C-alpha cells in the first residue's frame, strides 16, 4: 500500500471522468482508471501483432494475478475462487449445479437485484420454491426476519451484502449463522460492497460469494468472481463443463475428464483476456490505496452527502447507522418525481441514478466534498 494522498490518485487515475462530470454512480458502473485504459490498450495492440503469443503471454499471468488480488479483497483463498463472466453468471452456475430435491426452498428478500433471485426462479421446474421476505418499512431486515420463513426444507439463503435500491448493508455473519443453524447454504452477492468496504467472506461464514467487477472495483465489465467453500463443492453437480474444467487443459489425445478439485472446474474455456488485464490493473490500484483508506473515504463522503441532502430538505432513505450503511445514499424529493429530479441533475452534468424507487448517489474514494456540494446544489429545492 502506498501513502499517496487521495487527490494524487484523482489527478493521475480519474482526470478524464472528473473533467467530464460529477460522477456519483459507482453502484452502477465505475469509470476506468488511467492504468486500466493503458493496460487494456497495450493488450489489444499486442493481440493485433501476435495473437497466439499475446494469448499465451497474457492469459496465465493476468488470470493468476487478478485471481490472487480479488481473493485477497474478498477474504478467501485464491485456489477456491473461480473467474466468471459476472454476478449473474456465477449465481446461475450455482443454482443449476446445486443438488436439490422437489419441495426444497430458497430464502431471499423481495427487494433484491434480479440476478440474485432469477436463477432460483428458474429452478421451479425442479420443484424448488423461492420464498421472499419483505423488509421493514426502513428497508432493513435481520437474520430473525429471514429465519421466520425458513424450515426443514430450506436449502439456501441468498441475498446481497448491500442492497442496490436502498443502500442497506446487512449483517452477513448473523445471517450466515441463521442459515447454518438450518443446515442451509449462505450465498452472498458482494458486488455493491466489494472495493468500497473491507470483506472477509471466509471469516464471516459465507459459503458461496459472487461478484462482478464493473462497479466499485473499477474494472471493465464481463468478468467476475465465484468463491465456493471447499466443504460445499460436493453439493454441486458438474454443469457448464468445458476444456478449462479439467486438470490437464492441454491434453487432447486421448481426452482425460479429470476435473479440477476446486470451484475452478467451472471455468469453462477461454477467458475474457482483456477483461482480466483490466481487472488486474484496477485491483492493483485498489491495493495501492488500501481498502481501509478507501472505506473511510467512501463512508465519509456518503455520510456527508446524507447530511447535505437533509439540509436541502430531501428525505434520505438509506440507513444512518454505521453498521448498516455503505457507499450508496438513497433519497427522494418530498413531492417531485424521481425522473424529474434526475433530469435536473443530468442537465447540471451530475451523474446519479434512480433505483428501487429512490434517487441514488454512490461516491467513490476519489470523489470530493466539493463534488457532493455541487451535486446537492444542483438538486431542485
Model region roles, listed by residue range:
Residues 1-381:
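Pyridoxal 5′-phosphate
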Amino acid at each position: 500500500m502506498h501513502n499517496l494522498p487521495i487527490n494524487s490518485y484523482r489527478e493521475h487515475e480519474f482526470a478524464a471522468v472528473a473533467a467530464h462530470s460529477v460522477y456519483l454512480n459507482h453502484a452502477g458502473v465505475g469509470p476506468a482508471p488511467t492504468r486500466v485504459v493503458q493496460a487494456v490498450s497495450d493488450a489489444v495492440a499486442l493481440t493485433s501483432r501476435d495473437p497466439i503469443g499475446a494469448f499465451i503471454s497474457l492469459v496465465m499471468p493476468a488470470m493468476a494475478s487478478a485471481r490472487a488480488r480479488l481473493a485477497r479483497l474478498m477474504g478467501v483463498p485464491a485456489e477456491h475462487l473461480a473467474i466468471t463472466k459476472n454476478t449473474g453468471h456465477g449465481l446461475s452456475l450455482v443454482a443449476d449445479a446445486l443438488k436439490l430435491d422437489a419441495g426444497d426452498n430458497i430464502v431471499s428478500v423481495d427487494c433484491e437485484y434480479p440476478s440474485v433471485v432469477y436463477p432460483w426462479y428458474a429452478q421451479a421446474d425442479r420443484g424448488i420454491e423461492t420464498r421472499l421476505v419483505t423488509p421493514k418499512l426502513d428497508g432493513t431486515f435481520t437474520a430473525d426476519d429471514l429465519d421466520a420463513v425458513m424450515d426443514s426444507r430450506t436449502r439456501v439463503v441468498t441475498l446481497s451484502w448491500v442492497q442496490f435500491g436502498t443502500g442497506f448493508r446487512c449483517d452477513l455473519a448473523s445471517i450466515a449463522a441463521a442459515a447454518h443453524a438450518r443446515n442451509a447454504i449462505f450465498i452472498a452477492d458482494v458486488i455493491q460492497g466489494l472495493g468500497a468496504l473491507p470483506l472477509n467472506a471466509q471469516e464471516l461464514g459465507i459459503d458461496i460469494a459472487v461478484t462482478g467487477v464493473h462497479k466499485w472495483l473499477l474494472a471493465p465489465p464481463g468478468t467476475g468472481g465465484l468463491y465456493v467453500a471447499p466443504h460445499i463443492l460436493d453439493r454441486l453437480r458438474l454443469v457448464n463443463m468445458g476444456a478449462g474444467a479439467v486438470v490437464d487443459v492441454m491434453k487432447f489425445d486421448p481426452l482425460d475428464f479429470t476435473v479440477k478439485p476446486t470451484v475452478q472446474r467451472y471455468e469453462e474455456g477461454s477467458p475474457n483476456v482483456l477483461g482480466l488485464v483490466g481487472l488486474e490493473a484496477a485491483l492493483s490500484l485498489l491495493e495501492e490505496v488500501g481498502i481501509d483508506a478507501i472505506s473511510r473515504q467512501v463512508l465519509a463522503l456518503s455520510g456527508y452527502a446524507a447530511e447535505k441532502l437533509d439540509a436541502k430538505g430531501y428525505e434520505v432513505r438509506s440507513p444512518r447507522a454505521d453498521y448498516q450503511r455503505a457507499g450508496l445514499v438513497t433519497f427522494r424529493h418530498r413531492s417531485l418525481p424521481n425522473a424529474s429530479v434526475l433530469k435536473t441533475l443530468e442537465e447540471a452534468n451530475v451523474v446519479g441514478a434512480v433505483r428501487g424507487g429512490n434517487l441514488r448517489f454512490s461516491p467513490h474514494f476519489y470523489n470530493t466534498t466539493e463534488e457532493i456540494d455541487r451535486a446537492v446544489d444542483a438538486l431542485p429545492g
